[in-house]
């Protein structure tokens, strides 16, 4: 009761000696150069150091410093050091266990900084050594020792048997997950005009708590308020929720002048994940630009800052700690991870207010936050220790979606699939080629459709080849393209980079009276050039007017999807921003992206290319996990590096995408691997030049019409990596479950064939469960040996195996199911290699691949172990359309299963095409090649009443143009008949 009472009151560190125990009020300062040097360590001059000297070369060398204290106990050591880059020093008192201390860069080799640690000393003489036999150490100036005040611990429970132990006497905290200490001696700090640290300078620390209900649920908000010592008030805040195993923390600085450029709610030199068989630290990039890669570094070599989230894990046990920001509207956040020079513990420091030109692309430091306000708050940080680091990262992804809900409208339609012109056509794009691509998808690959029975056909950069006069020119060709897509049942897409200026010269900005130079983002007064383009200030009214102008053009043209690119340009730190109150790149990003989404007004699927990995989750439906990959196995490996370590982003985005899937002239194996990389990531955007002939067309007709493969992405979710110890290379093995089916993808990125033995338990499957196995590329069933606990797959060089495992074997093993057009009939052939209680096959047909109806039955063989061939002929397929077929296999007990869906098109020469359709004016009628001679065109109402009749003795280019504006709004039938009585019909919608 006494401790609880004290913990909830404001107490003065030096005024509670009777309650807290005796606290000697003294400290001593010791110059390190007074010690004994060894192994090449040497004294160096340093004007900013005390005594103008320091000790260097402490990687290969060491220094031993004698210290005398009156009482045995734990002491706070404040170490003064200088280093140009982050380095670790080992502090060893009296040849005991060394204390590794990672020292962040101090600002240069002659600039001194300080860091605190704890050492245990004996009464009387002590010898403290400083060295780093595992790497390079910082230069050391001096250290100060003061007895550590008696701890006063406030316990903050969370999760199951987890707690934070906050030491009110010393301003640090330990974190226990399921009664295991993982984080020790963590502190908070804030960088304003001075540096404020939770563990130094404050004389009073108070604990309070109150219920809280926010987006994460109902829980408790725990607040440690630090004051005194002539410092600005600091508050350390912890959020806990009964239903969550993680906790969240933030730090605030309060009072006049509390604005900050960097804040850290958690910095610890003593993180121990308690599992070290294959200890890894994960680097997560800020964006997907410049072919950046994720990297799972070995812990002993880790010394880097990861973007927004940092993960320390053991790949063998899979236990791991995840620390990351879940708020991105104000701060860029880095998670500094260091294991270099350590054997077990790690250094972890959250850095809200972090920039790095090679990672965040910034060319200046982070902007100040809360300028002119009375309080400055860091982002909220998730801290989670998971039994499986992969699950922990998925929880982190979900937490981001909770903390910052989508600004873009929720996507309820099917997983997007389609084509993008940048894959192969690129700068050669024109209207003719764009239409030829549409025709290829409409006529040659009718099964390649998403669950909504459509595809997106997206014009990328160089769409302005179709707008003579540029952005202010003639958009009629784009409108024609969009209408042509829709006439074929497809959806048109467009591309734009809204926050860049490729011209880089001053001129009037489209849609406004501003000049481009007024809108350029500037650093040190100069335009900021990234990726060959000047960044535009996303808060400037000229940038906004340009966005509104062009988005309205796209909407008027009829586009239903937009791919937006080079978004990281909008997040760059700048000298200043146009909009008042905006001081950081992420604040500017929020302004620009919200304005862009407002202009789109729910009219399009929004798809991001180069963009911030995590902060973009609010604004788009779909995002590329990597960028600018095309066809070969090396590019498949590059995209799958991002999927291996970034798959969890599908918790924030409706879909993540593996970039262009281009088959080109690569080997069949590389084509399969490229396609599989998209399926593993969760969507499929192709990119070949389907306006010209080549082997890629044949490959596409085969690979893109394999319904077993296409069904994998129905849920739009990525596969999980099995291992996380591949450095900056991709994993070879991925797994995903859908219902009672499990999919295993095994990639061979090498130049030689390779055999893979897959431990089913390691993959996450029931090793004792009998499974039916099917190779989805070949369609063949494989011998099942899964009850042995593993399967072995041989994968050719630069290839992939994609296997489906079903938890219960099907009673009938189907192979070689095919359907082909024979004159004006459809012939279906299939075989079985085994049958158990097979009653019959019901043949079903559909015109939309959704609503199927039975058209015939073939009796089954009951039970058989022999190969049996079956055949059925559909003598009345619907002509001028695509007919879809499937087999419904029915057992004697009435249970059933479906085959894959097959498509047979009867419209190659016979279809009647109308576009645009719907229309309220001009209409083009494409005349089928089977209609000859004089033609009679008739438009009738639904009751058969003619409303328009015309005759044509000849037509140019097999096209007829008419104007349907005089017709009333409604649905009509348009018929075209030749002199021989051949007749074709199509539905016409007048809007």
Task: Give residue spans per PLM region.
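Carbohydrate-binding surface patches
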Residues: 67, 75, 80-81, 247, ...
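Glycan-recognition surfaces
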Residues: 509-541, 545, 587, 591-695
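Carbohydrate-recognition beta-sandwich/jelly-roll modules
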Residues: 155-451, 561
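Short, surface-exposed loop/turn motifs with a glycine/proline- and acidic-biased composition
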Residues: 859-884, 953-980
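C-terminal beta-strand-rich structural cap/linker in extracellular carbohydrate-active enzymes
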Residues: 128, 785-809, 970
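Short, compositionally biased serine/threonine- and acidic-rich segments at solvent-exposed termini, linkers
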Residues: 807-910, 932
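C-terminal tail/sorting-segment detector
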Residues: 892-908, 949, 969-991
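Extracytoplasmic
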Residues: 28-152, 792, 805
């Amino acid at each position: 009761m006494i401790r609880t009472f004290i913990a909830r009151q404001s107490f003065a560190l030096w005024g509670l000696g009777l309650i807290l125990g005796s606290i000697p009020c003294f400290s001593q300062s010791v110059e390190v150069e007074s010690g004994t040097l060894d192994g090449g360590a040497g004294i160096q001059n340093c004007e900013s150091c005390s005594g103008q000297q320091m000790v260097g070369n402490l990687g290969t060398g060491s220094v031993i410093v004698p210290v005398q204290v009156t009482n045995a106990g734990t002491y706070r050591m404040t170490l003064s050091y200088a280093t140009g880059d982050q380095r670790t020093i080992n502090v060893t008192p009296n040849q005991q266990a060394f204390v590794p201390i990672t020292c962040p860069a101090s600002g240069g080799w002659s600039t001194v900084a300080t860091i605190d640690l704890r050492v245990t000393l004996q009464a009387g003489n002590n010898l403290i050594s400083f060295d780093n036999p595992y790497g390079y150490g910082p230069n050391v100036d001096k250290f100060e020792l003061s007895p550590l005040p008696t701890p006063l611990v406030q316990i903050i429970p969370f999760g199951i048997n987890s707690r934070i132990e906050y030491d009110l006497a010393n301003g640090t905290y330990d974190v226990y997950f399921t009664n295991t200490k993982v984080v020790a001696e963590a502190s908070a700090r804030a960088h304003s005009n001075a540096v404020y640290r939770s563990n130094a300078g404050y004389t009073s620390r108070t604990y309070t708590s109150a219920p809280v209900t926010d987006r994460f649920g109902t829980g408790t908000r725990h607040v440690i308020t630090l004051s005194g010592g002539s410092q600005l008030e600091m508050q350390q805040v912890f959020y806990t929720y009964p239903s969550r195993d993680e906790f969240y923390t933030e730090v605030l600085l309060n009072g006049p002048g509390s604005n900050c450029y960097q804040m850290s709610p958690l910095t610890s030199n003593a993180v121990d994940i308690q599992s070290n068989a294959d200890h890894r630290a994960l680097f997560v990039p800020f964006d997907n630009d410049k072919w950046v890669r994720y990297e799972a570094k070995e812990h002993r070599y880790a010394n880097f800052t990861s973007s927004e989230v940092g993960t320390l894990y053991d790949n063998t046990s899979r236990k791991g700690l995840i620390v990351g920001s879940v708020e991105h509207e104000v701060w860029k956040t880095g998670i500094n991870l260091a294991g270099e020079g350590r054997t077990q513990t790690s250094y972890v420091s959250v850095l809200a207010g972090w920039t790095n030109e090679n990672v965040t692309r910034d060319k200046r430091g982070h902007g100040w936050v809360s300028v002119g306000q009375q309080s400055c708050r860091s982002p909220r940080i998730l801290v989670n220790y998971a039994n499986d680091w992969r699950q922990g990262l998925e929880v982190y992804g979900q937490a981001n979606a909770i903390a910052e809900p989508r600004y873009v409208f929720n996507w309820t339609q099917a997983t997007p699939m389609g084509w993008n012109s940048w894959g192969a056509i690129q700068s050669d794009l024109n209207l003719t080629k764009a239409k030829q691509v549409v025709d290829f998808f409409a006529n040659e690959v009718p099964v390649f459709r998403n669950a909504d029975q459509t595809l997106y056909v997206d014009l990328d950069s160089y769409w302005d080849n179709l707008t003579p006069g540029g952005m202010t020119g003639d958009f009629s060709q784009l409108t024609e393209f969009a209408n042509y897509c829709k006439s074929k049942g497809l959806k048109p897409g467009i591309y734009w980079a809204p926050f860049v200026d490729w011209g880089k010269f001053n001129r009037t900005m489209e849609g406004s009276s501003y000049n481009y130079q007024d809108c350029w983002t500037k650093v040190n007064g100069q335009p900021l050039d990234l990726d060959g383009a000047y960044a535009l200030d996303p808060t400037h009214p000229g940038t906004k007017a340009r966005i509104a102008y062009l988005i309205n053009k796209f909407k008027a043209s009829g586009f239903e999807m937009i791919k937006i690119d080079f978004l990281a340009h909008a997040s760059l730190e700048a000298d200043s921003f146009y909009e008042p109150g905006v001081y950081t790149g992420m604040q500017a990003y929020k302004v620009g992206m919200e304005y862009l989404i407002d202009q789109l007004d729910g009219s399009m699927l929004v798809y991001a290319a180069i963009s911030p990995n995590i902060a973009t989750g609010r604004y788009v439906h779909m995002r590329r996990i990597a960028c600018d990959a095309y066809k070969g196995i090396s590019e498949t490996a590059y995209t799958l590096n991002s999927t291996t370590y970034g798959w969890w982003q599908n918790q924030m985005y409706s879909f993540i995408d593996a970039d262009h899937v281009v088959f080109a002239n690569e080997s069949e194996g590389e084509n399969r691997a490229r396609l599989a990389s998209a399926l593993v990531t969760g969507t499929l955007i192709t990119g070949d030049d389907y306006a010209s002939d080549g082997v890629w067309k044949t490959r596409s007709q085969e690979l893109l019409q394999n319904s077993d493969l296409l069904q994998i992405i129905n849920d739009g979710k990525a596969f999980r990596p099995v291992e996380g110890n591949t450095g900056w290379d991709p994993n070879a093995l991925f797994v995903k479950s859908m219902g009672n089916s499990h999919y295993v993808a095994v990639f061979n990125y090498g130049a030689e064939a390779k055999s893979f033995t897959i431990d089913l338990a390691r993959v996450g499957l029931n090793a004792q469960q009998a499974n039916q196995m099917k190779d989805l590329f070949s369609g063949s069933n494989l011998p099942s040996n899964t009850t042995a606990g593993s399967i072995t797959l041989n994968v050719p060089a630069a290839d992939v195996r994609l296997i489906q495992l079903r938890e219960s074997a099907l009673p009938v093993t189907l192979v070689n199911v095919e359907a082909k057009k024979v004159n004006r009939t459809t012939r279906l052939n299939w075989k079985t290699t085994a049958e158990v209680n097979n009653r019959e096959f019901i043949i079903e047909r559909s015109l939309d691949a959704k609503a199927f109806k039975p058209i015939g039955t073939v009796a089954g063989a009951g039970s058989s172990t022999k190969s049996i061939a079956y055949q059925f002929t559909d003598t009345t397929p619907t002509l001028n359309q695509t007919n879809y077929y499937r087999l419904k296999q029915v057992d004697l007990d009435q249970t059933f299963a479906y085959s894959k869906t097959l498509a047979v098109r009867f419209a190659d020469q016979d279809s009647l095409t109308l576009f645009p359709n719907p229309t309220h004016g001009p209409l083009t009628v494409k005349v089928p090649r089977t209609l000859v001679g004089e033609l009679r065109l008739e438009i009738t109402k639904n009751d058969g009443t003619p409303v328009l009749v015309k005759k044509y003795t000849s037509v140019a280019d097999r096209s007829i143009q008419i104007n349907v504006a005089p017709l009333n709004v409604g649905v009509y039938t348009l018929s075209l008949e030749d002199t021989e009585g051949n007749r074709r019909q199509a539905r016409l919608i007048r809007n």
